[in-house]
Amino acid sequence: MEYKRVLVKFSGEALSGNSGFGIDVKILEYIAGEIKSLVDNQIEVGIVIGGGNIIRGVSAAQGGIIRRTSGDYMGMLATVINAVAMQEALEYLGVDVRVQSALEIKEVCESYIYRRAIRHLEKGRVVVFGAGTGNPFFTTDSAATLRAVEIGADVIIKATKVDGVYDKDPHKFSDAKMLESISYDEALRDHIKVMDDTAIALAKDNKLPILVCNMFREGNLLDLLKYKKGICSIVK
């Protein structure tokens, strides 16, 4: 299958580098370069970034002072910060890009309108979707799947720090084996750590494949989408 329109999802933590917090500009530029390689090959790209490098709603609410709903809204705002940073990095590399937010912040970015997002993609612009779904209690993984379905993406790319889905944690077990392919039902049954169950269930309902790959393997995204030779696991 030829992938003409894709949704790339990666975590906010990926932007923070070794510090674990904030935005590492070198990593930001590297990721923007990987996205640019897709655009240069006529692949339409939407992006969803998490906000964990700034704040996580669940973590913020653990002490009881901040309510979960407020914590989640704080997390949504964090994703907008990351989206604006990615916009700047892509524009620095000469890529035309728009940020659309599920929460209205008209001085900073466009509000999310799916028809407008599709029009941007058709014109060759990258669209970075911020503020998750706009609702608390939903993860950015769920937001990524929702946006992918809405814009008619051919596939979701879940870009991580590992090469794919493993039978056990590769950071803890040296004999962990990567799975080239896994069904939606298997992913839901085993509660794989790559995406949450809500996101996987939505992908299943819409027959949307999920490619899980290592975003720090340079050139891998383009290899996967254009040359069908990259390293990944596929959930379908």
Swiss-Prot record:
Reaction catalysed by this enzyme: UMP + ATP = UDP + ADP
Region (Involved in allosteric activation by GTP): 17-22
The entry's keywords: Allosteric enzyme, ATP-binding, Cytoplasm, Kinase, Nucleotide-binding, Pyrimidine biosynthesis, Transferase
Binding site for ATP: K9, F10, S11, G12, G52, R56, T160, Y166, D169
GO cellular component, one term: cytosol
Protein location: Cytoplasm
GO aspect biological process, one term: UDP biosynthetic process
Database matches in Pfam families: AA_kinase
Name of the gene this protein is made from: pyrH
Similarity field: Belongs to the UMP kinase family.
SUBUNIT field: Homohexamer.
Top EC class for this record: transferase
Protein name as catalogued: Uridylate kinase
Domain of life: Bacteria
Binding site for UMP: G51, D72, T133, G134, N135, P136, F137, F138, T139, T140
Biological pathway: Pyrimidine metabolism; CTP biosynthesis via de novo pathway; UDP from UMP (UMPK route): step 1/1
Function text: Catalyzes the reversible phosphorylation of UMP to UDP.
Record comment: activity regulation: Allosterically activated by GTP. Inhibited by UTP.
EC number of the protein: 2.7.4.22
